[in-house]
Amino acid sequence: MSVGMAAPHAPYACDPDRSRGRLVAEPPSRTRSPFRRDCDRVIHSTAFRRLKYKTQVFVFHEGDHYRTRLTHSLEVAQIARALARQLGLDEDLTETLALAHDLGHPPFGHAGERALDACLKEFGGFDHNAQALRVVAALEHRYPEFDGLNLTWESLEGIVKHNGPLTDRSGAPVGHYREHGIPVGIADYIKVYDLELWSFASLEAQVAAIADDIAYDAHDIDDGLRAGLFDLDDLKAMPLTAAIIAETSAHYPDLEDVRRGAELVRELISHLIGAVFAEAQKNLAATKPQSAQDVRQQSRALIAFPADVAEEEAAIKRFLYQHMYRHKRVMRVMGEAKQILFDLFAKYLKSPAELPPEWLTGAEADNEGDRARRIGNFIAGMTDRFALTEHQRLFDSTPDLR
């Protein structure tokens, strides 16, 4: 048993003693399992620290209590660990994937991703999962023997495949990737290190992915209430949240709205975690996987919402899309944020000398695609705050994003 390993694993869990290893071989740690080392490397990375000033929905300066990419990632990790513990999975690997899942996000949330994707359209586009892989495989410069974090194979496959297979066994893209193709960063990397894009990822990765959904649903409701984009009465339009609100009101008729909102978020998380756990138990009993590789060979994800809860969860996402993500206030700020990234990309492409010295290598290449990708990597690593400051340095007028 690896040093530092928690409770005994279920047979279908990823076993750190049987890890497929790292691209660059390293001697084992005397005090930590391979997956614990992965998690610690993510936590100590500069990319992880930068998440503190990256938008979840609201730009960092709009309020001190709104989620950022960092606080969101910590909340995803808490939910993921709880599920992993219940299912007998490796908590260290699960935590690694929960904390690493947003490392590739650019500043200004999904608006920033759309802006960079447009800027890089002629050069393979921008995909935050592919960018997370670039971060952990190349862009972090902390170790003398290798670029990136040199994570285990299991962590890398989880970062790339947590939402499911990208190809079939023949290598043909499936699902979303059938139309858009395999993101260039992933397609390039698997030539060096095969992540078996045709298979499902481990249960640890599947748990991290569904924990992300749960955290989004519950905590975006919390932030939306705090921002005044909607209120508790609006949330009664959905049967699940209406039932939780009604039960809370029955137990605590005089409770103020702030506490009722907090109780809604808490009960919603508990409800969704419980539903996922019950569905996972049912799926595991039906398929009887005896190893992590058995999990990868399945024809569907084993960690999922049951059908009725999946519809409840989809209704929450529809509500948030209409009342929060597409709210005119949010849309106005995100429109201005996209323009900031358009401006920065065009400026750096025309005048690479404006980049920091350490980023000039590659940005002055003769190949325009190489230059564009280098600039895209630089912008993707920016925080909201740095992007604003850099725009103010390079341009006469910069929106304040308020």
Curated annotation (Swiss-Prot):
The keyword Hydrolase applies. GO terms for biological process: dGTP catabolic process. SMART domains: HDc (SM00471). Residues 69-217 form the HD domain. It holds the Pfam family HD_assoc. Keywords: Hydrolase. One of its GO terms (molecular function) is dGTPase activity. SUPFAM superfamilies: HD-domain/PDEase-like. InterPro entries: dGTPase, dGTPase-like, dNTPase_2, HD/PDEase_dom, HD_domain, PHydrolase_assoc_dom. Belongs to the dGTPase family. Type 2 subfamily. NCBIfam families: dGTP_triPase, PRK01286.1-1, PRK01286.1-3. This is Deoxyguanosinetriphosphate triphosphohydrolase-like protein.
